[in-house]
């Protein structure tokens, strides 16, 4: 599958998307550039599909990609939040878990911005 380079090496691009997916899971809505949001969408949807499966192998696959960050006041991390809170919401839904909303251009460089959030 073709992907945008976003002006980064492949390792930096992977690190960027790991951070963005983790932030999306924790906050459930993030603001980023339109191109990053479009590239992030299939990755985030894959994580939700794995979380819906719910088995140990799926949990390990998600944990290998998502950063280990505290997601809430109880000290639960992002992987736990994805499996316990977000995935059950989409139990009856087959794909289309995220939505991209266009925002105005960024101040400074006028880059087109967008919000990506869970439906």
Curated annotation (Swiss-Prot):
Pfam hit, one: Ribosomal_L17
Disulfide bonds: none
Keyword annotations of the record: Ribonucleoprotein, Ribosomal protein
GO CC terms: cytosolic large ribosomal subunit
Biological process (GO), any one: translation
GO MF annotations in UniProt: structural constituent of ribosome
PROSITE patterns for the chain: RIBOSOMAL_L17
Complexes and interactors: Part of the 50S ribosomal subunit. Contacts protein L32.
Similarity comment text for this entry: Belongs to the bacterial ribosomal protein bL17 family.
HAMAP family: Ribosomal_bL17
Protein name, entry field: Large ribosomal subunit protein bL17
Native organism: Brevibacillus brevis (strain 47 / JCM 6285 / NBRC 100599)
């Amino acid at each position: 599958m073709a992907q945008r380079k976003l002006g980064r090496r492949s390792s930096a691009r992977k690190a960027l998307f790991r951070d963005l997916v983790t932030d999306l899971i924790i906050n459930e809505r993030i603001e980023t550039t339109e191109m990053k949001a479009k590239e992030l969408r299939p990755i985030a949807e894959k994580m939700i599909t794995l979380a819906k499966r719910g088995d140990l192998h799926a949990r390990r696959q998600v944990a290998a990609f998502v950063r280990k960050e505290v997601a809430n006041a109880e000290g639960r991390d992002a992987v736990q939040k994805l499996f316990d809170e977000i995935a059950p919401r989409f139990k009856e839904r087959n794909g289309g878990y995220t939505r991209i909303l266009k925002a105005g251009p960024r101040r400074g460089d006028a880059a087109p911005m967008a919000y990506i959030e869970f439906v």
